[in-house]
């Protein structure tokens, strides 16, 4: 299993809570970093029920309610019903490095599933499973304790009293639509809660849910 070393020097320690930012520029911005503009990297711990974008015609919660920074865009997606690390930047090359399939950038997820996965199920995840859009790459998959840093979700997950739950640490090297959820369902253990902890060299690193901070490239 590929190991990740997250450097504390990668990130600045100043964090911000900005839950009610009421103004955000509507001016269209290119995803290419303008010349002479320094690279900005924002790490955000996305709460549940927040879209990974700055606008939404349906009036749902978006990034603009939390991040008052213009000209940055999410590197990859993190679904509305998922939580955790979202990396935003104005640097297109960095976005590509984090998200393009050929780069094989590792992404670490902590996943609460229904039931207790068997060794056969874990081996299937590690070796790759065949989904409706083709076989997945081999992945890291291990049964772990509930993370000590875990925050309460609002609203809580729906649990069935007769069925236990457990936590997996899953490392992917690709990024298909709702891939983790589809993989755990494929081996018989549906995902109840999904938190992305790390993406390449960036991690949550004690960043509170709903907060953001600047990092270096």
Swiss-Prot record:
Responsible for synthesis of pseudouridine from uracil-2457 in 23S ribosomal RNA. The keyword Isomerase applies. Transmembrane segments: none annotated. Its EC number is 5.4.99.20. Residues 19-28 have a biased composition (Polar residues). GO terms for biological process: pseudouridine synthesis; rRNA processing. The gene is rluE. The active site is at residue 79. This is Ribosomal large subunit pseudouridine synthase E. It comes from the Bacteria. It catalyses: uridine(2457) in 23S rRNA = pseudouridine(2457) in 23S rRNA. Coiled coil: none annotated. Keywords: Isomerase, rRNA processing. It holds the Pfam family PseudoU_synth_2. Belongs to the pseudouridine synthase RsuA family. NCBIfam families: PRK11394.1, pseudouridine synthase. InterPro entries: PsdUridine_s_RsuA/RluB/E/F_cat, PsdUridine_synth_cat_dom_sf, PsdUridine_synth_RsuA/RluA, PsdUridine_synth_RsuA/RluB/E/F, PsdUridine_synth_RsuA/RluB_CS, RsuA_PseudoU_synthase, TruA/RsuA/RluB/E/F_N. It is an enzyme of class 5 (isomerase). The keyword Ion transport does not apply. Residues 19-38 are annotated as: Disordered. GO terms for molecular function: 23S rRNA pseudouridine(2457) synthase activity; RNA binding.
């Amino acid at each position: 299993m590929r190991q990740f070393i997250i450097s504390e020097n990668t990130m600045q320690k100043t964090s911000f809570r900005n839950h009610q930012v009421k103004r955000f520029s509507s001016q269209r911005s290119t995803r290419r970093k303008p010349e002479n503009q320094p690279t900005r990297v924002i790490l955000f711990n996305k709460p549940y029920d927040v879209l990974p974008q700055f606008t939404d015609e349906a009036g749902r919660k978006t990034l603009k309610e939390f991040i008052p920074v213009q000209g940055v865009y999410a590197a990859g997606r993190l679904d509305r019903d998922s939580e955790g690390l979202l990396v935003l930047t104005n640097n297109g090359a960095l976005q590509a490095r984090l998200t393009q399939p050929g780069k094989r950038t590792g992404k670490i997820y902590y996943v609460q599933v229904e039931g207790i996965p068997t060794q056969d199920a874990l081996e299937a995840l590690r070796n790759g499973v065949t989904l409706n859009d083709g076989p997945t790459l081999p992945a890291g998959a291990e049964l772990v304790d509930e993370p000590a840093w875990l925050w309460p979700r609002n609203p809580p997950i729906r649990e069935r009293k007769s069925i236990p739950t457990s936590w997996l640490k899953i490392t992917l090297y690709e990024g298909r639509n709702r891939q983790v959820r589809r993989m755990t369902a494929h081996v018989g253990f549906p995902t109840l809660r999904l938190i992305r902890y790390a993406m390449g060299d960036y991690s949550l690193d004690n960043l509170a849910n709903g907060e953001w901070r600047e990092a270096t490239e």
